[in-house]
Amino acid sequence: MAADPVTSAQPAPTTDLLLIDRDFAAWPLDESPLLQALADWLRLPGRRVRIVALDFDALARSHPRFARWRRDWGHRIEALCPVDGALPPGLRLLAAGPVVLQWLDAPDWRLRRITDVVHVRSLREQCADFLQRCEPAWPATTLGL
């Protein structure tokens, strides 16, 4: 199953998931087992998911089930977009606690699993710097007048 690398990256003590990609087109976000695993994980106290993308419209078109599911979890899922409209090289990843999965080739699902403390810390610092240059995007609901 394509979602196994994603769901297996969630160690028990992890309270924060960070997903970064241009549009998540190659990610298995619409798979029911993944959505159920994320829902079960989000039900635990203090859990949140941050999603950073350049094109949330493409994400919603590619993954309509995820887009609908996300509305119910809008209080726990934060969607962000870089203000300069660019992703730094090498920050196409999923970070979950002490593990980072870095995408090398999405069509073939070649990933690099990083558990080395120094390397994970370095990537997390890069992510923290990058997140400071992001703004909220893709609201869970749209208020109409």
Give the label of every model feature segment:
Residues 1-16, 22-145:
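PLD/PLD-like phosphodiesterase catalytic module centered on the HKD motif
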